[in-house]
């Protein structure tokens, strides 16, 4: 990892050298003020991960941890070319799209007796079986099916070889350190290596690896093997929804040139300068929002129910984006098709 900036260092460096994406200090403060009203409620608590999302596992056992591992291994590229035509999966009487279509497909497979969360199964699962497991209820398939198949096989084999087929063994090797778990994941599983170049420096976002650590912390409710002492070192997860909501809320701004590109729906390739700026500035923006929010909480003498970190802010803003999808229609999100987010 020599000379490689951490996600937080990367974000700060990108924000300081950005040409097309800018953080608005007034907007940062306004978002922090919006979040202040939620600081004492259930929305910014670890319990919300299970309470608000019915597809997430209820348990805190090995099976729940392995569910998290397989969903985050496949947690990338759910955006559709059109809002009208998208991949949708029905489960439990409800229809889901985006990331939740994956969770619904995993739960549907488990209900059908397919052991999709077992490494010994997905290490050798065939492409046709993956197509069946991730099948859409519409004519639009889940994107990147071949990549998902390849990654499942690769990841399953590594989990069997190095960690006895269970992600819980990997978690237990981390000595209750979020950073140690993050490094175990990116060192052992190639598809989690979300690393590129910017201004001559090697930078990392580790979107899926960080969300895997965060979801492990959440599914274990921050207790036992999931009691990570350094959980606040994890940043927001740089994807395509969070930048959109930060622009909508006025905390992030795009240059006219970039905005035009995004409005036209032009693809930005992974590692492209503007794509890196969007992701990096979003991460740094959430770090600044968190700092501002903690300052406001201290000034008001509010009592929060637990430590407020970037993970909980990310969870809240991501849900906010989903709940305000109609209002945000005029704000474009960037189109990048890759396995990292």
UniProtKB/Swiss-Prot annotation:
An example molecular function term from Gene Ontology annotations: hydrolase activity
Keywords: Acetylation, Hydrolase
Active-site residues annotated for this sequence: 239
Catalytic reactions on record: queuosine 5'-phosphate + H2O = queuine + D-ribose 5-phosphate
Enzyme class: hydrolase
Record flagged with keyword Hydrolase: yes
Pfam family name, one: Q_salvage
Function field: Catalyzes the hydrolysis of queuosine 5'-phosphate, releasing the nucleobase queuine (q). Is required for salvage of queuine from exogenous queuosine (Q) that is imported and then converted to queuosine 5'-phosphate intracellularly.
Family under the similarity heading: Belongs to the QNG1 protein family.
Protein name: Queuosine 5'-phosphate N-glycosylase/hydrolase
């Amino acid at each position: 990892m020599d000379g490689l900036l951490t996600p937080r260092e990367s974000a700060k460096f990108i924000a300081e050298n950005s040409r097309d994406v800018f953080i608005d200090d007034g907007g940062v403060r306004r978002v922090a003020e919006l979040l202040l009203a939620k600081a004492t409620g259930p929305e910014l608590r670890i319990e919300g991960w299970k309470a608000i999302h019915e597809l997430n596992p209820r348990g805190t056992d090995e099976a729940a941890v392995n569910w998290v591992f397989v969903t985050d291994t496949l947690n990338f590229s759910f955006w559709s070319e059109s809002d009208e035509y998208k991949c949708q999966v029905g489960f439990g009487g409800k229809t889901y799209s985006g990331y939740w279509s994956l969770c619904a497909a995993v739960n549907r497979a488990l209900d059908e007796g397919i052991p999709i969360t077992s490494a010994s199964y997905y290490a050798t699962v065939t492409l046709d079986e993956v197509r069946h497991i991730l099948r859409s209820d519409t004519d639009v398939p889940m994107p990147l099916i071949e990549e998902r198949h390849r990654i499942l096989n690769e990841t399953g084999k590594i989990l069997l070889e190095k960690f006895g087929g269970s992600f819980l063994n990997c978690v237990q090797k981390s000595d209750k350190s979020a950073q140690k778990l993050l490094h175990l994941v990116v060192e052992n599983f190639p598809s989690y290596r979300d690393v590129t170049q910017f201004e001559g420096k090697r930078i990392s976002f580790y979107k899926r690896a960080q969300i895997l650590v965060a979801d492990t912390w959440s599914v274990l409710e921050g207790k036992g093997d999931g009691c990570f002492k350094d959980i606040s070192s994890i940043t927001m997860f740089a994807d395509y929804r969070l930048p959109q909501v930060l622009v909508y809320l006025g905390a992030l701004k795009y240059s006219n040139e970039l905005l035009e590109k995004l409005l036209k729906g032009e693809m930005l390739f992974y590692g492209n300068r503007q794509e890196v700026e969007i992701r990096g500035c979003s991460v740094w923006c959430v770090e600044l929002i968190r700092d501002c929010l903690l300052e406001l909480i201290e000034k008001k003498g509010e009592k929060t129910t637990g430590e407020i970190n970037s993970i909980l802010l990310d969870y809240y803003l991501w849900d906010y984006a989903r709940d305000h999808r109609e209002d945000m229609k005029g704000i474009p999100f960037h189109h990048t098709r890759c396995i990292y987010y």
